[in-house]
Curated annotation (Swiss-Prot):
Disulfide bridge positions per record: C32-C63, C41-C54, C135-C231, C184-C210, C207-C216, C274-C287, C377-C414, C387-C405, C481-C562
GO annotations of cellular component type: early endosome; extracellular space; plasma membrane; recycling endosome
Residues the record lists as binding Fe(3+) 2: D429, Y457, Y573, H642
Signal peptide: 1-16
Record GO biological process: iron ion transport
Entries under InterPro entries matching the protein: Transferrin (IPR016357), Transferrin-like_dom (IPR001156), Transferrin_Fe_BS (IPR018195)
Subcellular localization(s) per the UniProt record: Secreted
Protein name: Transferrin
Organism: Blaberus discoidalis
Amino acid sequence: MLLCLTLLFSASAVLAMPTPEGSPHHEIYKVCVPEGALESCHRMSQESDLHMTCVAARDRIECLDKIKHREADFAPVDPEDMYVAAKIPQQDFIIFKEIRTKEEPDEEFRYEAVCVIHKDLDITSIHGLQGLKSCHTGVGRNVGYKIPITKLRHMGVLGPLNNSDLTPRENELHALSHLFSEACLVGKWAPDPAQNQALKAKYPNLCALCEHPEICDYPDKYSGYDGALRCLAEHGGQVAWTKVYYVKKHFGMAIGAGEAVPTGQNPDDYAYLCPDATKKPITGKPCIWAARPWQGYMANHDLDNDIADLRAKISLADTIGETENADWLSKVLDLNNKTIPIDNQGPYSPENYLNKANYTDVIERDTGAPHRPVRFCVTSDAELEKCRVLKRAAYSRDIRPAFDCVREAGLHECLRTVRDDGADVITLDGGEVFVAQRQYNLKPIVAEQYGEHGSLYYAVAVVRKDSTYQSIEDLRGAKSCHTGYGRNAGWNVPLYTLLSKELISKNSCPYSSALSSYFSGGSCVPGAQLPENNPANQNPDSLCSICAGNLDAPNNDPAWKCSASNDESFFGYSGAFRCLASGEGQVAFVKHTTVPENTDGHNQAAWTAGLRSEDFELLCADGGRASINEYSRCHLAEVPPHMVVTSNDKTDIQLNEIRHAILAAGDLYSRRPDLFKLFGDFGGTKDLLFKNSATGLLSVENGSPLMQRYSEILEVIRACENQPTP
């Protein structure tokens, strides 16, 4: 009989209660969940006698850190998460339980990759694959792509994958195209649509066996695990890469404890091709090329004496969750009505768990030297740490080229480093993109997307609801807060607004002095006094007069005041709003998402405590005010997005591989923020690498409509450049 265990629940920090003397078990088990699953986790702890409580993390990668540092006890993980965990220094992780299917609860691996051929195929060496017709599940997939590429390369069958004139993906496609005479390899060969089509036009033989060779994408009769076997049996294929489960299903063989279901396909006409080129009967034990491990649960060695109890608790949770049809079963424990948690023979270390499936090299898929990573240039320690975490996470998820990180002191140092090939990319505000193009020979290649607004955002003026300002004209003499010098929402747009309304004369050069005079109460314009922004020493000191330096540092270094980095607390969107919210400023020039992101509990930073969005309003360009959510009718301008820029000196091949990696990361992590939160807070800091408000990324070219949106604003605010200073 199950004892009714006392329910313990905490919605915030979780502390394990003292273990009663003589008890072999934890009083409470702390399960780590990505923040998006926290509410479901709380329901789990409230609704069941599971002796579990919840620890929220940014994503699965942060869960690994929390388990390592004993802030959490366990979490569900994928093999890719295990790979990341195995690379963490001084870790003591253990995989103690697995998530298997009810159909195959006794199988050691989630699936086993096999090569199936016609039994009478004349092949005596693995090199005999040369010139054959090959059927694959799809590009980028484990069984039909990663595993054969990895293993055939190690065997010397597949050609070199390190041609510096080709991207990593094209190296693979080129090698497959020269190994096989024809194939069916559907899917997106590149995340950029134009590049995808160009590759398919270049290697058409890799689509020749597909149902629709001219499309070569899903859905296709000859794609997927079962489609690869149909391609072999019906469409002229000579070799198929699939998994054992679908071989059994295709040929009507028994699966797990189930009975055989005849399909009309004769298994005696086919055979497994082994890595040593021998053949084995389809009806016998398969020879596998590699296996994908099951998902599982990871803990640390502090749980060694509690593993049996924790295993039982997870199994109990599965029973309760299925009975109640609870959403937390999938969101918290990664289980569903087709899976079952199974005790393994371990616990195993993550490394040993992957190695027993021969899977580590499949994740790594090293193409060989020279390695050409995509190097992000960053300007703060917080951004550097996020970049390093992205590097590890993306590598485990097969995003190639790999990422790397370069730290510089500030924006212009980064721009020089990218120009001089010390780094490859940096993400910039639209106004900074203009500087990068004009002064550093850089160009945008990828743009952020913002949900329903696409690749634009609204620049807005925010005031306190209890203020008396009713128009831009009323702001004369006010204290102003800006995101940064030369940035779109914080500088270019308000300057353009004042000029277009003739509140500043178009002849009053330099405009920095004119704007300073208009906001005579003082301003914070981070970066205004940097030499590169103030070469003639014309920018007034008042542009930095209400800046604060680093309010969160134990010792506020005077050098930080008005710096164009997070060392200035009033820098960036959140910083400019903080300047307003703290009472230092009376208007903040930011983007339309800034106030919602920093009020009503959406930002956990101490300075946002108690801030309510209803206490702030938008100041409309043509007069009047509006609530924060009415930005579509009350804004100063629609402006282009933040963009990733690189050097104009990059070759087309280099541009393609940079785009490929960045777009692939954007695609994966916009769909699965639980794996890694690319768009969102990191360590309590906003807008690192990409803006919090971004929802995805897309390729952009010079001359596109995105770039054309700069023209009017830039033309107006640059009018002083060709005029002599009074």
